[in-house]
Amino acid sequence: MSNLPGRLLATIGAALAVAASQPAAAATGCPTHFADGVEPTLINTKLARSATELCNRRFVVLHSAVTRTPLYVAEHLTRTSVAAARSYDQRDNRFHADPRLRPADRAELANYVRSGFDRGHMAPSGDMTDEESDYESFSLANIVPQVGALNRNSWADLENYVRTLTMKLGNAYVVTGPAYEGKTIKALNGRVLIPTSTWKALYVPGQGAGAWIATNTATPRWQVISIAELTRRTGIDPFPRLTAATKAKVPAFPSFGRDRAKRDR
């Protein structure tokens, strides 16, 4: 792990800082994963310049060549898909570099070796319904460096909660991603940026929306926040079609501050 050189840090900071700019608009190639078929809006247009959309069977990734991680990952979960995922028990576990990305733009397996970080799924393997979609979830384009105490415990609890809630309510849109806040950004081997936090936004049609954000630390600090607050902090609006009132509301979501030993799914 290394601190980034000043010039590189300035470049990354410029690309990741939340700027007062017009949202980036681009037609998505995989609308079924998004609420109302509309992809998240990048409030900071600089993020879009280095971004590539990767469509998969059960999720879509917007990958950044600056961070060499996803900017976000979006999923549409249904009662049917979660039931299928729960009945599929042949998890793949074959992490791999994504061949759809140029080598210079993507993470490699070697970047994570002896790094001290887990390879944390943004779209969890536990949401995948079959062999092909599960293999896709182990692409490093769907992965961020995540502290093991978070990844294996309370973050896994959150993922399971979202699946359970979907089984109860029948339909949910989920957008997950890393946040890079503050002036000091570290990287694995000077290549893969280490997020300061990871977040998950949830929208249940007819019920409302909100988000969780957790610091990427051994003792994670969890917050339940509004979609508006998430957008302010990350520069990403996960659900552009929602009303301003819906985005401003802080939901009555449970917290996941208690870390219990669970296998990351």
Q: What is each of the regions a protein language model found here?
A:
Residues 5-6, 13-265:
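Domain-level detector for secreted/extracellular nuclease and nuclease-toxin modules, and
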